[in-house]
């Protein structure tokens, strides 16, 4: 387990690097259980299976659903591009994912650009209190750019283990 002095609320930006089985996911659960602010914490990870596993653990620990919003990085990027189509510059056929191998990278790139430009910072700040990214070692360059841009908007902590990287 993580030592009690690891406090994800303590720093505006940070990272937790630890090997498998050391409690990174439990640290996220514990942090969300302690969260009392009105706005939820945004939690991003890479796979739908990761989202489902985290949701199950949060439910098992009776963490209030209002304390968090969980999504994959791809799902979050898609939601932002869909919600702000003019600012993202993404066409409807790309949002329809007619060619996912082409469209997902285009969406990630566009979302990284418009978050970085600051076009939606106020909307993001009004929606979320902070960001936690699980399995950060699996981020590609475009996903990393999104996370870095978000870290300029609200407090951010990334958690991962480079020895577990799958990409």
Regions found by a protein language model. Name each.
Residues 96-129, 140-146:
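Conserved helicase/translocase P-loop NTPase motor core
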Residues 62-113:
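Inter-Walker segment of RecA-like/P-loop motor cores
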Residues 17-24, 48, 137-167:
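Conserved helicase motor core of SF1/SF2 NTP-dependent helicases
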Residues 8, 36, 123-124, 149-152:
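Conserved catalytic network of the ASCE P-loop NTPase/AAA+ motor domain
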Residues 1-83:
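P-loop NTPase Walker
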Residues 134:
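Charged catalytic and DNA/RNA-contacting regions of genome-maintenance
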Residues 40, 129-130, 153-157:
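Loop/turn-to-beta-strand initiation segments
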Residues 76, 127, 150:
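Short acidic/histidine-centered micro-motifs embedded in hydrophobic/aromatic stretches
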């Amino acid at each position: 387990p993580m030592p009690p002095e690891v406090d994800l609320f303590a720093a505006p930006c940070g990272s937790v690097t630890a090997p498998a089985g050391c409690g990174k996911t439990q640290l996220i659960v514990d942090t969300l259980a302690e969260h009392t602010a009105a706005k939820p914490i945004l939690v991003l990870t890479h796979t739908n299976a990761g989202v489902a596993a985290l949701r199950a653990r949060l439910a098992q620990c009776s963490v209030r659903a209002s304390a968090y919003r969980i999504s994959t990085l791809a799902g979050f990027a898609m939601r932002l591009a869909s919600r702000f189509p003019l600012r993202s510059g993404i066409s409807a056929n790309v949002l329809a994912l007619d060619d996912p191998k082409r469209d997902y990278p285009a969406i990630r790139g566009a979302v990284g650009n418009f978050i970085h430009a600051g076009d939606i910072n106020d909307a993001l700040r009004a929606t979320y209190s902070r960001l936690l990214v699980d399995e950060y070692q699996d981020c590609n360059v475009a996903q990393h750019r999104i996370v870095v841009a978000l870290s300029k908007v609200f407090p951010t902590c990334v958690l991962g283990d480079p020895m577990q990287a799958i990409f």
